[in-house]
Amino acid sequence: MVDWNAKYGAVDTMLYGEKPSDIIKKAKSEYADRLGHVLCLGDGEGRQSRALVRSGFSVTAIDISAVATNRALKRDKEDELVIKRLIYDVSKPPPLQTEIGSCFICYLHFSVTERQSCFRWVKNTLPTGGLLFIEGFGPEQPTFNAKYNSGGPGKIELLYDPKILQNELPDFTVHHSLCIEAMLGDGPGHQGLANITQMVLEKK
């Protein structure tokens, strides 16, 4: 199991940079009127949530790492942004006080048991018609990482295979699903050519 406090604490800069993931751009351009209050799970140092708030959305962000969350709060304050941040295990988040319209899970790679627990919670938390946005390393990433040192977990079960995720999310309709090669430039943590999965799903 990764010690995320140690991993974030080992660098004195944003581990994954400040640029949001491509799925954020897709959501803002194609689904803006349906996002509602946004939940970002595994938000780390806050690059996804800050991009959404800068575009006018209200956001709650949850991450397991106190180091990353405190760094995110510091950047929020510097940028004069208001984001509700919670420190929790994202495989079993707490009840939310605000109804959400959408949820983002970006580069959140954990065990099958934890992932399925998280998905059950998301299903129970999103309203009918709520949107789930997923982006992360695809099943071929170990090969890409060996060649390009672009990051990501080495265990296949931690990666995002669209077919497996679709089977784990039977209560959702898939609107967008792809697995592509993409060049990452996300801080020192993710650099180089990578195999990336993207999905957009709607709760039935």
Predicted regions mapped to residue ranges:
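Conserved class I S-adenosyl-L-methionine
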Residues: M1-D33, E140
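Conserved SAM/SAH-binding beta-strand->alpha-helix loop
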Residues: S65-V67
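Conserved SAM-binding loop
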Residues: A72-L73
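Conserved SAM-binding strand-loop segment of SAM-dependent methyltransferases
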Residues: D79-V90
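A short acidic, Gly/Pro-enriched loop at the edge of an enzyme's catalytic core
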Residues: P95-S102
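A short, conserved alpha-helix within the catalytic core of class I
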Residues: F110-V122
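Conserved beta-strand signature within the Rossmann-like core of class I S-adenosyl-L-methionine
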Residues: G129-F137
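Short alpha-helix
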Residues: I156-S177
